Amino acid sequence: MNIGAITDKGLVRKTNQDAIFSKVSPDNKIGLFVIADGMGGHYMGDLASNKIIQEFEQWWLRFEVAEFNKTDSECMDELKEVLNEANSYIYINYSRDKAISGSTIAVLLIYDKKYYMFNVGDTRIYMIDKNGVNLITVDHTLRTELENKTGVTETDIRNNPKRDALTKAVGTKSDISWHETEGMVEGKRFCICTDGIYKFVDDELLKKILVSHSSPQKICDKLVQLVLKAGAYDNYSMYYICPENKKQDGRTSAFCCIALLLIAIILFIIFR
């Protein structure tokens, strides 16, 4: 797999309440990618996001000990249970009086030829393929709820000061539900990012960069440049994943073609 990654506190926040985690199996067939965004300004937001990541790290260690001998459905069942356990721990241990601690989460599991994902909150996963860029997560925000209500206009939503408030997060309630989907990996790339990325970049420009043929890390770096230019007053985190490990840089492909051509010419001269 070819992967780009970045996380930072931004230009204004004193701490980074985002937490990220990724691991790939030795045979390059299984990859787990997780981003958690602690609820900004809330009590113990950084502890919530870090606790989530710790739980998924522990799961991967157990997976390694088992020599990756689990089916994809077994992995997903266990990962969802990990999320349930993290939710219970945060709700019981990090909530004090009326203070609420919580975090968003987006999880992507690449398992051989298939992908699986689930999310809570507004951390997003974009899927990139020959048809363009598609959002495969659901934002659990007031905006989303209002958009699904009849009679509510875009102006109404834009004028609502709480439009970006989360309606779901890990650790804010005793139980938790999530959005999930799955599909085939072939021909697809993925971008996981917090709102510190996508809220600071024009949507059309974001999509243009995501479909570009730059390397995964260059794509991350390009988006971060735009975030910094826009002020970066939130933490930001991102993964860009090419599961099929195909180089996205056209110049690299051209170089390989030229190199092969030169080798062929040399062999022809030697053995003619």
Short names for language-model regions:
Residues 1-272:
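PP2C/PPM-type serine/threonine phosphatase catalytic domain
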